[in-house]
Amino acid sequence: MGNVVHDSFRVMSPFNAYRETEFMSDSLPAKPAENSVDLTFLARKPSFLECDDAAAFLHGMKFEANTEVLWFILKNSQGRYFCAEFVEPNALKVDNDGDPADDALFVSMCSRGRLCVPVGYTVAASFHSHPPADQGLQESSAEWSYRNRFFTCYDLWKVINTRRSYSRCYLSTGKDGLISYNSNASDFERELSRHLAKKTDGSSRLFQSLYERGGIPASIWMLLAIGAGELKMVVKGIVKDAMWSRRGALEASWKWDIDPNQVKSSSVELMPIFSPVFSDVAGIAACLRIRRRDSFAEQSAGVILKHNFRDEFIATAAEPCDYVNFDLAVVFPKDQHGNVQLPEGFRVYGFYHSSKPSLPDLLPPSDAERFENFFSPVDMKVSFDRLVAAPQHHVLMLTPDNAVLSFSQPDIPVRSLIVELTQDFQHKVISGEITTQMFVDKVAAAGNLSVLLPSKTWPDVGRIRPSVEVVTVIAERAE
């Protein structure tokens, strides 16, 4: 299950190469997104703040189409979460006690019929993705679609039966989003589990058998699940006809909620999805580059947080939006007093955003490639305004050619440059009155402009220094 790697990678898998159970994550390799990169990274045992974050990371992986996928999310004694692939028993190396080696981070089924997990971890949740089921003879297209976008009876039975090993499960439906079910051990749930349990001969009971053949409407099964436990949309769908386009709890009124004619609530219910925990901002930069959207048709932005007392960094998942309109309230919920809520112990370190695609007629006559792979004058002004209000913050930008640029520590020239950027500065660059290099020099002279991850346009990692001419002009103005 979970065929996301080729056999060659299975042989070379580094799952057994890390004996220490540290909960900090190493920096990601600076490579474009691909499953081998994700798997190599997961072999390093990256930790996540919440179970939802780990599930969302798995949801972002590109699994082989039309295959059964099963992973588990583990929790360690420090309360951090980790991703672990399910490995069939015949492919698992175990010690003399029948348990997997304590340096391995995968889950298997032991001979005694229980889940085997690495020492120091417990199972927090299962993660599933299923191939499409065949449509039933009397099943409508709508109900068939619902059935292919919801948990199977067996998925939920595993978390609601009295002998369960974990009480939460996730289902990835690709571009239709990620949903979760959390058991609340209700009387209704216990009664439902009796009707989902296998018969003594191992065969399915009538309800499950009918449902799997399309004989029971999926919408009825969904209502039963909603009444039994806690269902929520963890990652919303990104396709036009996604069943759920809003994160949050799924209620019995879910059909009404997905009606395109209904007015959607704009309030944020849940904490945003966060990246793994990193020990430095370079790890965040690499993660953003690997997990960036495949399409550059729209701009996206997010927030970077740092722990108040430890070198721990996390970033929110990218939110499609214009950077100029982005702020904390876009992704974070508010308390009863209207204050933005952050994870306990964390503060805002800065913001990140991708570039906004430029139309061909809005490019300068020369050095257009550098202009496209740099902060736009409009976005730069937004960042300057933020940094004047909070000088301790940092701004990261992901360029189209996969560089990650950073600006921080604003200096005195920032205020004068803000004024200059409001006076149709972009038109002057496009017309050639101001060259792209002059714009880069002005920004470099106004603070710490750096390349965190290189690209063709920005091949050298480190601080970008302004030219001598720009420095001289600024010094004369200061006098």
Which stretches of residues belong to each language-model region?
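Glycine-rich short-loop/terminal segments
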Residues: 2-122, 204-345, 437-479
